UniProtKB/Swiss-Prot annotation:
It comes from Neisseria meningitidis serogroup C / serotype 2a (strain ATCC 700532 / DSM 15464 / FAM18). CDD domains: AdoMet_MTases (cd02440). Transmembrane segments: none annotated. The lineage of its organism: Bacteria, Pseudomonadati, Pseudomonadota, Betaproteobacteria, Neisseriales. This is Ribosomal protein L11 methyltransferase. GO terms for biological process: methylation.
């Protein structure tokens, strides 16, 4: 059975209300996406400690699905009126029914990080059976290996981590770096995130990968220092957390920072140079990674 798919560009003030109104009046589904997804103006939305969390992109698109014979135009008009919108422009297309699970899975292929490290969704065969394969499915927590900052951190772990070292992954998201550290030889690894959903996702992913990782909310993190501290978050929390991350790093231990843009590396380097001897920044697709050794 074919469906009508309608796309409406709106601002963040009305996106959620419009999606709810469309559902209330008969849409089969309504999703909100970044209107600039896939372009240079794409807007990343993450919660930052101490900052109000943005929930909706400033410019969003509401994508609604209707049945083949639904009066989509009339429903859109009613929903628009309820949201105080006039002359609401939209585009529409007909899409055929299909196996949506299979379609979604087909969009995620194994990701090669290095000669020996792969990120592989659970529904794929491991591309190289003798390689280190992280089984990780796209989900609700950030971190699938596709983002440059995640790859930068994974490459550091792949080449620099020493067997038996203890690792703290602060802002762990899906737990990808925590799990990778253990698979690459860490003696222990702990993931921390401000989002309970990320903590749950980390535990689930660790179980899927048969590794003994621990995950905590910040208040639950036990006292202690680590040989390696990794923080793949954003520039603002990295500014705020510098002293704490330094305190969690053993003397002679190492820190790995990412989630910052190339142009932010110099400023962040100035902050962390209080505690660490920093290596030259590594960059990929406009994102940067800092690393260094604690004095």
């Amino acid at each position: 059975m074919p469906y009508q798919q309608i796309t409406i560009n709106v601002n963040d003030a009305v996106a959620e209300r419009l999606a709810d109104a469309l559902m209330e009046h008969g849409a089969l589904s309504a999703a909100i996406e970044d209107a600039y997804a896939g372009t240079q103006n794409e807007q990343a939305i993450f919660g930052e400690p101490g900052m109000p969390a943005e929930q909706i992109w400033q410019q969003s698109k509401v994508i609604a699905l209707f049945g083949e014979h639904d009066e989509a135009a009339a429903i859109i008009q009613i929903a628009a009126q309820e949201c105080g919108l006039k002359d609401l422009a939209y585009t529409g297309e007909t899409i055929e029914d299909q196996d949506w699970v299979r379609l979604t899975q087909s969009q995620f292929d194994p990701i090669r990080i290095s000669d020996r490290l792969w990120i592989t969704p659970s529904w794929h065969e491991a591309p190289e059976g003798t390689a280190v394969n992280l089984r990780l499915d796209p989900g609700l927590a950030f971190g699938t290996g596709s983002h440059p900052t995640t790859r930068l951190c994974l490459k550091w772990l792949d080449t620099q981590l020493k067997n038996g070292e203890s690792v703290l992954d602060y802002g762990c998201g899906s737990g990808i770096l925590t799990i990778a550290a253990l698979k690459l030889g860490a003696g222990s690894a702990v993931g921390v995130d401000i989002d309970e959903q990320a903590v749950r996702a980390g535990k689930d992913n660790a179980e899927q990968n048969n590794v003994d990782a621990q995950f905590f909310l910040p208040d639950g993190l036990p006292q202690g220092q680590f040989d390696v501290v990794v923080a793949n978050i954003l520039a603002n929390p990295l500014r705020m957390l510098g002293e704490m991350l330094a305190a969690r790093t053993k003397q002679g231990g190492r820190i790995v920072l990412s989630g910052l843009l190339d142009e932010q590396a110099e400023e962040l380097g100035g902050i962390y140079s209080q505690w660490f001897d920093l290596d030259p920044a590594e960059t990929e697709e406009g994102w940067a990674r800092l690393s260094g050794t604690k004095r």
